[in-house]
Amino acid sequence: MVDRNSKYRKGSKIVINYFVLYFNNCCIHGFRYLTDSMLILFEKFLWLILLVASIYFCIIVCLSSIDRYYTKSTHIGIERNYIFWNTTLPSVTVCPVDRLNITYFADFCRTNGIKGPQRDILWDFLENLANSTYINFQNIPQNEQIDQIIEDIGLKPEHYTELIYNLTYDRTYEPNFNERIRCMDGAMFIHVRQVLTEWGLCYLGNSKLTEEYSSRYFIFGKYPEYNKYEYENIRLPYQVGSFFQKDTQYALLGFKGPAIIAFAHSAFEVMKVDSNSDYAYDGVLYDLSTEEITAEDNLEQDTTVAMRRCRFPHESNLTHFPFYTRNICQQECRINLAYKICKCIPHFYPNRIANPKPVCDYKTLRSCFPQHASFFLKLYEENGNHENPATCYCEQNCHDSVVTMKSMNPMSGAKQLLGGIGSAVSVKTWPQSRLRRQVIFSLTDLLVSIGGTAGLFLGFSVLGFVEVIYFFTIRIVFQILGYTL
């Protein structure tokens, strides 16, 4: 028992002597006064109070710097050197009212033995299904004949969109120039593609989104095929303008149906299903203005999503979509909300995921969705009928633009003059300021701030930190082994 106490006292003395050795030799101000034999107890106590206070305030200020780094390291500033800018024109998405191709449909009916009145019933059903969205699901026809036809051809809900796609002719690949859907600025061709939206298959022009946003990629996971008719001509991926161009415009043309539905939106975004032009029988001419939101080149590398509170397109955290925009994020919110309320999702959403959600049959689209249409579109309800409100937060786009509509007018005489209808975008005035996301407190600033704080309160430095590591790792090992340094 005595030997054990003796060993304990001896070990405690060694530990105390080692800390005294460190206090006498460390570069942190004030520690050596705690072990100085020349000072009386009151002086040592005074130095201890000063050291505790300095360490406390050093930690508080350092934590404040860390909090600033993670929560306030970026801001949105204003730039005004507008004479050096090129501003991207807004995008336009056009959805034709007549979706199906009569030739493809005839071949499908011939292959599946659909004749006579059944053929007309199926055509009407598929056209309404292809044009259906949250505001008009109730217009999908329902009767026993449709049920019988669906049963005969073995059409399952998860194949609705694939069938509509196969019966729709992508007229951006039309050899005849006058029949082709094209996006043009005078003699210059602008890239246009077929996309799958919440209003079915539509056409998008002047977009800065990647080719992953296309109907073929959403449905089959394949990029759009090479369009030789577009690449044979002088082609722009998207149209830009500058302050010195007083009137810049382009048109998305070639629609032969009785009417179209058009959406004008940011070139960095997708259309919103509730921001359409209604049915336009002569086409739509938009007079718009736009103000871009840009980002510093180092914003992505120097910050995380939580720090900058925005996402770049390739930083998708979504399940159904391979890229990110705020409107796409809200579409995923609608997917989850529809699945929660109606136990299935509409047919026009991409569903190529590890665990696909069940797709609604047309009867569920008619019965469940119309009564919740406002909730699905707004993602909230003013009267609060639903027990569990939609919990959906979508970060902003790091690159974006604010599009303001000055006017929206019909393109009178477009059918006679151009042989079809479409939508045109005109920008007559250019912004003299734009917003820019900037890093104002980088990791280097954080290290300088912490180092300056530690130096101010404790006289601490990088070498002081190395000294602590050295004393309590390498030196203590040698002390245990019995070596003297």
Describe every region a protein language model picked out.
Residues 1-485:
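Non-transmembrane functional regions of membrane and envelope proteins
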